[in-house]
Swiss-Prot record:
Protein's organism: Yersinia pestis
Predominant location category: cytoplasm
Gene behind the chain: glmS
Locations listed in the record: Cytoplasm
Protein's recorded name: Glutamine--fructose-6-phosphate aminotransferase [isomerizing]
Keyword hit for Calcium: no
GO cellular component terms, A-Z: cytosol
Amino acid sequence: MCGIVGAVAQRDIAEILIEGLRRLEYRGYDSAGLAVVDSEGHLTRLRRVGKVHALSDAAEKQDLHGGTGIAHTRWATHGEPSEANAHPHVSDYISVVHNGIIENHEPLRELLISRGYRFSSETDTEVIAHLVHWEQQQGGSLLEVVKRVIPQLRGAYGTVVMDSRDPSRLIAARSGSPLVIGCGVGENFIASDQLALLPVTRRFIFLEEGDVVEVTRRSISIFDKQGNAIERPEIESQVQYDAGDKGIYRHYMQKEIYEQPMAIKNTLEGRLSHGMIDLSELGPKADALLAEVQHIQIIACGTSYNSGMVSRYWFESLAGVPCDVEIASEFRYRKSAVRPNSLLITLSQSGETADTLAALRLSKELGYLGSLAICNVAGSSLVRESDLALMTKAGTEIGVASTKAFTTQLTVLLMLVGRIGKLKGADASLEHDIVHALQALPARIEQMLSLDKTIEALAEGFSDKHHALFLGRGDQYPIAMEGALKLKEISYIHAEAYAAGELKHGPLALIDADMPVIVVAPNNELLEKLKSNIEEVRARGGLLYVFADQDAGFTDSEGMKIIQLPHVEEIIAPIFYTVPLQLLSYHVALIKGTDVDQPRNLAKSVTVE
């Protein structure tokens, strides 16, 4: 959600901070700010509501100098978007940036007011600045002071503290919100996402839960939650430096839709061989664990939840393993009964989704057979804290509305279904069929993308619409859910998805000539049932858009537009039918004039509850 960048260097670092914030814009924010200290201890703070370019313009006018600084993009949780609420927050010579939520900020605020502190914002972050300042009066180094402040805070946070009287160091602490150290030569950096620092380094140290770190130009000192000095591994980043460039595309989302064939190829690379699925990357003991699995519990949020819902059909119908899927924010706050030999699978593009991480940590106390993360970010908290991990290889995804991360999650899940099915004694043809279908998938999606202009023309029919229904059956029902999510995220059209068989249980009351109804209709065993549901909509004057297999026997008629799609193997149809819904949502958003890549009120990575 929010973004943090910090630097300790000999050179001027204002432009490094601003470029880092630019590269974090995809995470979602409403204001931005920075604070820079020069060698004489002079602090300059700039804050602006709106986009990073407004902050950049202000910085150019200031001609900022200084080798130590912190910067932040804010996504409002406490207090409206305003310059007063933007970070960094200061208390005399102390400056602080912070991601997360301090749950006990109200009693801390009252305590600090009683000590004579005056607050200039509505934020929870300002209490950190005043607490550090208060503790500094009691004595000790900045590192010692921050260590004393941390136990007073309840909630999730990643925070960086700077003292303008000593610009040689920054202190950072991580509890529930990610932070990464960028390792330079004679300079070091801090950020909430490695992407922010790729212009200046490719060497990173990912902080663990509870870590506190002191960063100077020449040293990085890390302390664990017990206060012990500890070494964390340094990792060479494999993220592409140009991942943040749109290239020839108008929006990141459009670029990422078109990158899906290559993203799927990359995800399959090295995992399909001689007609078999090779997941040896899981390690030598993984097969023994997977063979014991009698139940699968999937935990996810948002788009990842929809991919989990698709895989439930696959795990049960193809591998014969019972599977449940639950929203992470619900799972973590209820008492659950864990089935014998149950494998917990977590899904997250970023690997830092707060509720999913909390659910994983909770699961360790509940007796699961093991945990397996499916994630797009190597080195993320979810990957590090799980027993097993399978990486999607989608590359950096910038657009808030997930596209290639979703289809590569499904690709990995289908391979996992094939592997578990084989270990559980499924018919030998299952693995062959999955391999054959997945090998053909990138080319199938290329075919689909050639229909972009056709789908763009359809989008015109949504220009004056405020509501939409999506319908699907079987494993296409979660695809309808994903289509509805995409449309509401980026076009702000209220959209809902229903299993088509549920029409008579309520949704039919909404059908009229102003209600677009989008249907996904592959040529499978449920097609005739689906056709009956379509006729129910037609009989009530609904406006139908049917994405149908070319062999399904549909033709255009009054009130019903048919988009004929190439035939694909049933096993990969959910992945294939996702793409036209992504394109439809994208083009509708263009017509509506919304911010496609950074839709209002949303963030790419939800790192707070």
